[in-house]
Each structure stands twice: as C-alpha cells, then as structure tokens.
Amino acid sequence: MSPTPPRSKFPLPLDAVVQRKPAPARTAGMPAVGAPGPAQAQAKARDKQPSAPTAAASAVEARASAATAGGGGMASDRARGALAARLRASGIRDERVLAAIGTVPRHLFVEPGLASQAYEDAALPIGHQQTISKPSVVARMIELLREGLSADTPVERVLEIGTGCGYQAAVLSLVAREVFSIERIRPLHEQAKANLRPLRVPNLRLHYGDGMLGLPQAAPFSAIILAAAGMEVPQALLEQLAIGGRLIAPVAVVPPAGGSGQTVTQQLLLIERLNRHRFHRTALEAVFFVPLKSGTI
C-alpha cells in the first residue's frame, strides 16, 4: 500500500455545517420487535433540536457532487438513485435509509478498477481480506436499527464495529445524530479517513482500536451495528447498549453435534435491551460476513 499524505485530525468536527429542511417523512418500516424504551424516548424529546443527520446530508450531498464532478455514469445522481430504487423494490421501506443510500457516492469507497460495479448490489473486496457489504445488507441492517422510531426521528448515537472503507459509516451519518466507528486494521482505518475526507461528514468520529471492546468512553449507544460475524456478540458491546437500544449483528450458527451437516453458517441477530439485565433476541435471515476478530493490526 502506497504511503498516504498527511491528513487532517480526526475525529471530524460536528459544527459549522449549513442545514437544510428535514427530509420527507418515510413510510413505516417493519413492526418493532419490542416497545420503545428510554433510548427512543430520549430521541423523541430531541425532535425539535437541530438535526445532525440533516446537516450531514447537506454536507455529503454537496460534496459528493463536487467530488464526483465529471466522473461520468458512476458519478451521477442517477446511478445512486437507481440503486435506491432497486432496494425499495426489493423490500426496503425506510425512506430515510433509501435517501441515505441515494446520497452517499459508493464508488468513492471502492478501488478504481471496481468503480463500474459500485452501484450493483454486490459485496466488493477492499483489501486486507475484507469487503464492502452489499448495499441491500447495509440498508436492511440500518432499517432494523430504526424500527420503532417516528418518521422524522434520527437514531441518537450509533456505534459501528468494523469501519472498513467507511461506506456504511457515511450512510449511518445520514440517519443518526452521532456515529462512532471502530476499525482494528490500521491501513483500513487510514483508507476510510481518506475516503471520507472529501465528504467532510460532520457527525462521524472514526477510531482505531479493538471493536470487540467497544467504545466505553462514548457509551451508552442507542444502536450498535457489527460488520463482522463472531460466534457470539461480545459482552462489552451488550453492556454499552442503552436500555431500549438495539444491536444488530451477524453471528455464527453451529449445527448440533451428531447432525447430518457440520457447516457453520451465519444469521442476523437483533438484540434489544429491555432493562439493565434483560435482553430480547430475534434471529433473522441468513447472511455471510467476514469473521469478527479481536486485537489490532
């Protein structure tokens, strides 16, 4: 990997961003797994405050156009809009999520040689044996985090485990007031910073560290999303989830001993924190993610 030029200090600033009018109300998503708790109540109480996602959307939309000017078909609004339309047709109903997918220029987060595939619903390699997730998976997981929120209410504070190239973090910044993202692979952390720099996302903080430990200094989080699959969800992350908050993660499914097949598969797991000691778990569809690992490299 070639040396990278000096970069501005991260985390990125949260202020000095011009706002625009709030996005149109989305249609209702899937029913909430449990009743809204304190995390959602806190979000509703702040509805009338300036919205960081709207500020981020203004910043990202304007800078995406500038960063991709003259870039041809893959740089056009039409390519992003067409992707959002396909996701809507496939079952994604959260208009806020669809608008975010239609705003973030995915081709800026992939290798130039793969730019022609950036707006296909496909996972693509980003180096270091990691991938950028399929847009449909990104949209589905974020939509699950937003269940139970009103149409114009952002998620309060999100923790992402596995920044990768930074694409999902950029999408999250348009649906949440604050986003904290952790990456354990130093070159990917630097790559994400470089990818996000042209967009100057105001409500996103990137951290280099062990994602399995979470980010206790910024906890609690109203939502946590994992971009890698472990045998189970790390206890540290459960402890950092706010009461009433949601965590979405791919987890391994090991077949019972003595069964006909011993292939380990993965499925999405939605966890809601009901109170200090109780969690509600819902197993969802099959997925395939890179493995969740501890430590930093």
Swiss-Prot record:
Q: Tell me where it mainly resides.
A: cytoplasm
Asked whether the UniProt record includes Secreted among its keywords, one would answer no
Q: Where are the transmembrane segments?
A: none
Instruction: For this UniProt record, give its keywords in alphabetical order, as a comma-separated list.
Output: Cytoplasm, Methyltransferase, S-adenosyl-L-methionine, Transferase
Q: Does the keyword Transferase apply?
A: yes
Entry-linked CDD domains:
AdoMet_MTases
Swiss-Prot/TrEMBL catalytic activity: [protein]-L-isoaspartate + S-adenosyl-L-methionine = [protein]-L-isoaspartate alpha-methyl ester + S-adenosyl-L-homocysteine
Write down the InterPro entries for this protein, in alphabetical order.
PCMT (IPR000682), SAM-dependent_MTases_sf (IPR029063)
Give the enzyme class.
transferase
Residues annotated as region Disordered? Answer: 20-57
HAMAP family for the chain: PIMT
Compartmental location: Cytoplasm
Q: What is this protein called?
A: Protein-L-isoaspartate O-methyltransferase
Q: Which organism is it from?
A: Cupriavidus pinatubonensis (strain JMP 134 / LMG 1197) (Cupriavidus necator (strain JMP 134))
Q: Which PANTHER family does the record associate with it?
A: PROTEIN-L-ISOASPARTATE O-METHYLTRANSFERASE, PROTEIN-L-ISOASPARTATE(D-ASPARTATE) O-METHYLTRANSFERASE
Q: Which GO terms describe its cellular component?
A: cytoplasm
Q: Where is the composition biased (Low complexity)?
A: 28-43
Catalytic residues (positions): S133
Q: What does this protein do?
A: Catalyzes the methyl esterification of L-isoaspartyl residues in peptides and proteins that result from spontaneous decomposition of normal L-aspartyl and L-asparaginyl residues. It plays a role in the repair and/or degradation of damaged proteins.
GO BP: methylation; protein modification process; protein repair
**EC number assigned by the record:** 2.1.1.77
GO MF term set: protein-L-isoaspartate (D-aspartate) O-methyltransferase activity
Record-stated family? Belongs to the methyltransferase superfamily. L-isoaspartyl/D-aspartyl protein methyltransferase family.
